[in-house]
């Protein structure tokens, strides 16, 4: 059990970096997943990375009466103006040079994307929203959801935010942002590009404070662990699972699966459902999903054993053929 996920898992990263030799494996099973609005189990073969940071603007030594607003700089406005340069009104990230660091989608991933269909109407009902960003739909929506980088304002804090009126000119303003990272985009690239982007626009005074990060994890649907999990889902749930090449969420998966060479393949699933509301005040799971997941795990263990036995048998047969060929030549 690792309890620092929300903090960026700093202790886990230190441990895995020091003990990479202990983590080499044929596959990794991760515990992130759910059943969607149509009750299809969702299996992910990786996770986006993440960069979490703060932008801070500073003004007077302390909050002032707002009568000074005509002549004293307001850090809240300063921060808002800086934030407005980071994305377009349509939600496209506009940081200089950002798009040039996004890897093209591989042929294998493009084929997997074709099999995914989001329950757009059901999700909109669940979230109580009227539409998606940039009015996307269909394959474009799926592609953006899984392979699109993000820049999310997670919170803004400045001035007087309690109930009632108070005429305040804030002394500080802070925004917390997270960036979800896709292939070829790293924490270091994002921080450096953001710093340069703000500096070019006259925002050298905006402070960037790095709070945490995690690299992405990415593997193939052809791996032994992926095949075992997908086949087991068919058998246990009686329905074809949705297979995501990469989960839109993030976590310390890269710290575990990315430290060995080659990286360890990962397949992830979970016991939540569309209404679980992870990280919300009413986060929950259903008892039936919990019980069915026990059967799912049992079937995966069986499938992994069968797959590895088959692989070893093939290797043994190939070795016998090689030896026979050598003997015949001699």
Model-predicted segments: where are they?
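Acidic/histidine-rich catalytic neighborhood of metal-dependent amide-processing enzymes
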Residues: 1-46, 309, 323
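Acidic, glycine-rich active-site loops and adjacent beta-strand->loop/helix elements
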Residues: 1-8, 31-35, 59-61, 247-249, ...
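Alpha-helix capping and helix-loop boundary segments enriched in small/acidic/polar residues
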Residues: 3-7, 42-43, 70-71, 220, ...
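Short coil/turn connectors at secondary-structure junctions
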Residues: 22-26, 49-52, 262-265
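A short glycine-threonine-serine/GTX helix/turn-capping micro-motif
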Residues: 64-72, 163-166
């Amino acid at each position: 059990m690792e309890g620092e996920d929300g903090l960026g898992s700093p202790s886990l990263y230190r441990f895995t970096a020091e003990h990479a030799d202990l983590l080499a494996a044929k596959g990794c099973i991760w515990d992130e997943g759910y059943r969607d609005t149509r009750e299809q189990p969702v299996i992910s073969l990786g996770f986006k990375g993440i960069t979490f940071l703060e932008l801070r603007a500073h003004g007077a030594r302390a909050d002032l009466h707002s009568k000074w607003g005509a002549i004293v700089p307001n850090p809240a406005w300063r921060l808002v103006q800086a934030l407005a340069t980071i994305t377009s009104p349509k939600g496209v990230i506009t940081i200089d040079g950002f798009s040039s660091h996004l890897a093209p989608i591989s042929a294998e991933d493009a084929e997997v994307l074709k099999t995914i269909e989001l329950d757009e109407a059901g999700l909109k009902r669940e979230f109580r929203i009227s539409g998606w960003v940039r009015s996307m739909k269909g394959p474009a929506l799926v592609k953006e959801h899984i392979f699109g980088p993000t820049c999310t304002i997670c919170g803004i804090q400045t001035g007087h935010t309690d109930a009632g009126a108070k005429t305040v000119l804030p002394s500080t303003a802070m925004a917390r942002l997270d960036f979800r990272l896709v292939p070829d985009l790293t924490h270091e690239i994002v921080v450096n590009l953001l710093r340069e982007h703000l500096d070019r626009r006259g925002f050298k005074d905006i402070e960037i404070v790095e709070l945490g990060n995690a690299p992405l994890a990415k593997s193939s649907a052809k791996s032994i662990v992926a095949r075992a999990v997908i086949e087991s889902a068919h058998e246990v749930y009686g329905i074809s699972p949705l297979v995501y090449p990469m989960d839109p969420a993030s976590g310390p998966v890269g710290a575990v699966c990315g430290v060995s060479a080659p990286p360890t393949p990962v397949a992830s699933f979970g016991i939540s459902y569309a209404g679980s509301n992870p990280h919300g005040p009413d986060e929950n799971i259903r008892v039936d999903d919990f019980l069915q997941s026990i059967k799912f795990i049992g079937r995966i263990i069986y499938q992994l054993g069968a797959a590895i036995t088959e692989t070893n048998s093939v290797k043994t047969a190939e070795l016998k053929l090689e030896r026979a060929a050598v003997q015949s030549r001699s």
